[in-house]
Amino acid sequence: MKNIFLHSLNLENYRNFKNLELKTDNTPIILIGENGSGKTNILEAISLFYPGRGLRSAKLANVCKTSEDHCLVKALLQSKLGLAEFTTQFKRSSNRRITEYNESKIANNELSKFTSMVWLTPHMEGIFTSGSSDRRKFLDRIVYNFDPKHAELVSKYEYYMHERNKILVEDRRDDNWLKIIEEKMADISNHIANNRLKTLEFMQQAIDDLENEFPKADLSIDGIVEQKILNGKKNIVSFITAELYQTRSKDKLLGRTSFGVHKSDFLVKHQKKNILAKFCSTGEQKAILIAIILAEMNYAIKLTKIAPILLLDEVFVHLDDKRRQYLIEFLTGLNMQLWVTTTNLEGIDNFATKAQLIKL
């Protein structure tokens, strides 16, 4: 098994940190400090070395320390391709983010070729009651760990969709280019939908196989393209292309693309109660979310032979003793780098003896 982990992390003008340097090993790491000390900021900085805008989905302008024009995050990281230096930096004045791998610029969506990461934050506990966009992004992040190329597909799809919207809204007479764009969107959509379905199959098996103290979930996806594939429809790409063509007039008025894999919803049910997670209590929702994360970790390691970095923000809060103890034993047995934030060590003191403590 190959472990992805940080050897060091350097922050410059990042959030509340003027300068911060951490040295770490392939072990559990506990960040302990009062609320507002910057624990979650450190997790967010690490999450920037994975496709997307980090675990907060923050705007670039909010990441730099107040009154500073630039900020920098640098990591010496054991990646899928070996030991490497990664940097990501922002400038308010240009509103640009630049990411580098061993001093060579790379696209944000390429990060999944080098790293693998899973995170759980208090904000995510509302994912079942929020909009479908949050759940869809959550599912796609899971897919990244099984298929690193998926991030690039999602990025390309969003680019072509944006181009299509511009052509329609600006009323350009460019049917040939529009046709090419829609054909590209259709082809990419087919790959995205199949990747999601394949990953859901893996994940459902992982959930059913893993005996633990958390409720099991049934996973599915509610999307026209995915359902057509499940129903065995042939010529999916042609079907999507035709739908995009037929919705041009409608989409021109709306100013957006009304059909496609960007409209799909990730559905989660409490398996035993047979009800959608959004109708469960907040405690049950958190427990279901943890169960999904544990299954993802377990199966990603089993299937890809790669252990991702795990970021857990205040995960032990409001867990009963039985579930807290199970989670500690599960995490300790993973033999990988995980980062945990907490305001105190109450209830996790035994776990702390096996971890690197960083006090803020």
Curated annotation (Swiss-Prot):
The RecF protein is involved in DNA metabolism; it is required for DNA replication and normal SOS inducibility. RecF binds preferentially to single-stranded, linear DNA. It also seems to bind ATP. The keyword Cytoplasm applies. This is DNA replication and repair protein RecF. One of its GO terms (cellular component) is cytoplasm. It comes from the Bacteria. Belongs to the RecF family. It comes from Rickettsia conorii (strain ATCC VR-613 / Malish 7). PROSITE patterns: RECF_1, RECF_2. InterPro entries: DNA-binding_RecF, DNA-binding_RecF_CS, P-loop_NTPase, RecF/RecN/SMC_N, RecF_2. ATP binds at G33, E34, N35, G36, S37, G38, K39, T40. Signal peptide: none annotated. It is found in: Cytoplasm. GO terms for biological process: DNA replication; DNA synthesis involved in DNA repair; double-strand break repair; SOS response. Keywords: ATP-binding, Cytoplasm, DNA damage, DNA repair, DNA replication, DNA-binding, Nucleotide-binding, SOS response. GO terms for molecular function: ATP binding; single-stranded DNA binding. It holds the Pfam family SMC_N. Gene3D superfamilies: P-loop containing nucleotide triphosphate hydrolases, RecF/RecN/SMC, N-terminal domain.
